[in-house]
Amino acid sequence: MDASAAISQLRQGQKPEWPQNANTSDFAKTLDNSSEFPKTLRHEYVVPTKAQLKRKTLNDDAQTAAKASSSDDEGIYFCGNSLGLQPKAVGEYLNAYLKTWGSIAVGSHFTPMADSPLTPFQDMAAECARRMSDIVGASPSEIVAMNTLTINLHLMMAAFYKPTEKKHKIMCEWRPFPSDWYAIESQIEWHGLDPKKSMLLVKPDDGYLMTTESILKLIDQEADELALIMLPGIQYYSGQLLDIPTITTHARKHGITIGWDLAHAAGNVELKLHDWDVDFACWCTYKYMNAGAGAIAGAFVHSKHGDNGSNVGLKGWYGHDKSSRFLMDNKFVPTPGAQGFQCSNPSAVDLTCLAGSLSVFQKTSVADLRSRSLLLTAYAEHLLTQIASRNIKDGNFPFQIISPLDPRFRGAQLSVLLQEDVMEEVFAGLEENGVICDKRKPGIIRVAPVPMYNTFEDVYKFMHILEGALQPKAEQKTQAHGEAVEARL
């Protein structure tokens, strides 16, 4: 298979032609060893073994202490869309943080250490912004590392949502992650408005996907009353990647402020926030950026809003310009750019984890990661389709892929819809065999092969386990007994 040609096809929205031996371990290993496209950076991450995934204590026994002797000993981790694996660099960075803090205490804020991977603590947020700039397609001054995602959404809406008697609506998706819903709802209520009248929901035309055409049409219809558009870059349930540049351009034609929640997009797909003229965006860093559970989040504010003046919404001392921050004269001078939107001193330990995780991104590019991701997810889709075709019962497929079939409009994630009672049994079967993915009610198993650390062999092994888990328990026992008898013969 010509992998480079296949990636080119996928970038154009076309499906590659898979060889007859695609559903074999040898084929998966061939892709993993190919020099035609970027290789995995799996060696930069801590990949849990199957034994470690089952541990209930931090004390090691012989099994949990043992290193994987082969890939068969490692778990299959397809949950980077929920929490990314730990980069090995994070441990190094945390050790440097602890030693610096322990050695020079408050001097850690200002004193550079010659042999440390860290900058002085007061400069860490700016360094993380610099490292995130290529990932989201912005200049460092347009990015700030602060808070967590929902707090940043609130701060951005406090600055950019300016409802009037006529223009008061916020457009959002029909099924946002609950925290987004609560944030939008409470911002509307904070202004004394009724969410039932001021929340405008974009609904799918059919099934689970929102079309660009329907979004643009709704903007046209509601433009006179829209004060803000806030949509997800990638919808968390379906994995749909929205057409950010087209929708943003259309909002701009109507003079409507537009912001994006990029929780599932940042570090996953190529973004050009500055060039696309996005007003603001927010993202978390614990998914595809691998900075750890609840890690410090990121926000983007376009440079056209970066002069700030006094219009940074809610203020705090850390948004004050660094050059005069410690004068303490209560005369707010905002830091130019996105960092003027800071309120509090960001957590240095959180920034340490983020800086460590971002150091791995400096060894690759988002374009290379996207190329690898396109092929990984297309391979997963191909094998899922084969499994579905082999397991039709009573004329029904065992599951449905609800993510977009056009590879241009999805990231790493494929959302597999099963009947909810079946989902629990299948999910348990996956876990029993060292597979980690996640489930979302009703009936969805989200499968996300992450290009940073997942392999084509991971995909192949996952599919073999999934097909076994789809079989009713009685059939599994019969099949296992038959295989045991055959082995004795």
From Swiss-Prot:
The gene is BNA5-2. It is found in: Cytoplasm. Residues 1-25 are annotated as: Disordered. It catalyses: L-kynurenine + H2O = anthranilate + L-alanine + H(+); 3-hydroxy-L-kynurenine + H2O = 3-hydroxyanthranilate + L-alanine + H(+). Its cofactor is pyridoxal 5'-phosphate. Pyridoxal 5'-phosphate binds at L149, T150, F177, P178, S179, D180, D261, H264, Y286, W317, N345. Residues 1-12 have a biased composition (Polar residues). It comes from the Eukaryota. Homodimer. Pathway: Amino-acid degradation; L-kynurenine degradation; L-alanine and anthranilate from L-kynurenine: step 1/1; Cofactor biosynthesis; NAD(+) biosynthesis; quinolinate from L-kynurenine: step 2/3. The modification N6-(pyridoxal phosphate)lysine is found at K287. This is Kynureninase 2. NCBIfam families: kynureninase. Its EC number is 3.7.1.3. GO terms for biological process: 'de novo' NAD biosynthetic process from L-tryptophan; anthranilate metabolic process; L-kynurenine catabolic process; L-tryptophan catabolic process to kynurenine; quinolinate biosynthetic process. It comes from Phaeosphaeria nodorum (strain SN15 / ATCC MYA-4574 / FGSC 10173). Pfam families: Aminotran_5, KYNU_C. PANTHER family: KYNURENINASE, KYNURENINASE 2. Belongs to the kynureninase family. GO terms for cellular component: cytoplasm. Catalyzes the cleavage of L-kynurenine (L-Kyn) and L-3-hydroxykynurenine (L-3OHKyn) into anthranilic acid (AA) and 3-hydroxyanthranilic acid (3-OHAA), respectively. GO terms for molecular function: kynureninase activity; pyridoxal phosphate binding.
